[in-house]
Amino acid sequence: MLAVNIPGLKSGELVLDGKTLGDIYLGKIKKWDDEAITKLNPGVKLPSQNIAVVRRADGSGTSFVFTSYLAKVNDEWKSKVGAGSTVNWPTGLGGKGNDGIAAFVQRLPGAIGYVEYAYAKQNNLAYTKLVSADGKPVSPTEESFSNAAKGADWSKTFAQDLTNQKGDDVWPITSTTFILVHKAQKKPEQGAEVLKFFDWAYKNGAKQANDLDYASLPDNVVEQVRAAWKTSIKDSNGKALY
């Protein structure tokens, strides 16, 4: 999610869209009262303050997700910078880890940075709304993250890119954490126990995930995962382990 430190603005009061966000990270938009931002925020008094862009100094999955989103919604970003866990950033201060970005945003008036939702919530950072693929401002919440997973097509791969998904109340910069399991299990007893554990986690882990400020997978996605276990994960004789 996008964390900001803009004096006079409340959390969730500012709205950005992908094109404008990309232009901020390209260094083209330099002040918070730029016309592109004011058009998205009628009635909001924006300060004539320099934007302090904050990004990751180290390689990260968070940067991969963020830049993948920008490459989808900003053509200039796609052609000049692209997507990756590390990129040649056009501008910005580099923070190490989510905590490094959070610390910069907290200290610097006018700052904007991208962090995991949990870091922003636990550090009481103000957030922006973001215009979704459906053209509506959306707030970052566990529900809007789950909605991104709910509407995705998981039929071909579970390594889904959930950025800029269409649907009602979908946060456009969403990603999943996933686990790799060998389809052919050389130690089937251990493999079966691993699947039992993850099955237990799906049944019982939603509250723990939410308590840690993560979103749980929607039921329809979990059922697709279980179906894949039944058809794909087998022992050396071709017997299913789940």
Language model segments and positions:
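Flexible loop/hinge segments at secondary-structure junctions
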Residues: 1-242
